[in-house]
């Protein structure tokens, strides 16, 4: 059985840390529950040219957006970055729409949520974003989902996960939950360890893996 792929979209200046927790655990699989299938993480961009993150790291995309294979996909992750507001990302937004239509999860954080709002992809799911007023302003007529907006760090509704840029931990948790890779006990211990930074949660994490 072929390993499913989690695609991560890269663009110059993207916010390194926003998908950091999620991809580290998805790639390593170190806390996966026994029944969870291993996943591969692949990066995609508009071209195969190197991408420089907000942190100055140079990354070489694995493939271009048009090479994404929906049939092999487990999820599409869209990290934030200022480029979402200025550059054109129609191709990846079309892919996001195709993923949702195929009932394959899409996870967007920070400015990526605003980009989804601009193309009407937040109108039928409960969601969060940077700020509702900002989303309304930038989304314009394409955004009619304000009744479904929730003031939460991260929101999962069906196959759509959205998060504020300040919530990479909660974003990761919703991703692990949707992909069903952690046991409930592991998920809780993992989150509390990173959130509260107390030794008891490390012990709980180890115990959850026993």
Regions found by a protein language model. Give the residues of each.
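Active-site-adjacent pocket-lining segments in enzyme domains
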Residues: 4-15, 21, 28-47, 57, ...
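A short, charged, and often flexible helix/loop element on the N-terminal side
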Residues: 54
């Amino acid at each position: 059985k072929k390993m499913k792929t989690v695609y991560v979209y890269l663009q110059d200046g993207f916010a390194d840390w926003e998908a950091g927790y999620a991809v580290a655990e998805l790639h390593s699989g170190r806390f996966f529950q026994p029944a969870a299938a291993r996943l591969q993480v692949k990066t995609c961009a508009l071209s195969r040219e190197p991408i420089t993150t907000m942190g100055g790291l140079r990354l070489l995309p694995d493939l271009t957006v048009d090479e994404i294979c929906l049939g092999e996909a487990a999820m599409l992750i869209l990290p934030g970055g200022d480029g979402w507001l200025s550059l054109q990302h129609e191709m990846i937004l079309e892919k996001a729409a195709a993923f949702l239509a195929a009932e394959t999860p899409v996870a967007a954080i920070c400015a990526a949520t605003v980009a989804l709002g601009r193309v009407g992809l937040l109108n039928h799911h409960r969601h969060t974003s940077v700020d509702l007023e900002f989303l309304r302003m930038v989304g314009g007529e394409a955004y009619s989902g304000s009744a479904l907006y929730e003031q939460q760090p991260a929101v999962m509704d069906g196959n759509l996960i959205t998060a504020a840029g300040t919530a990479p931990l909660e974003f990761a948790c919703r991703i692990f939950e949707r992909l069903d890779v952690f046991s409930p006990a592991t998920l809780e211990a993992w989150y509390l360890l990173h959130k509260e930074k107390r030794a008891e949660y490390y012990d709980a994490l180890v115990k959850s893996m026993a």
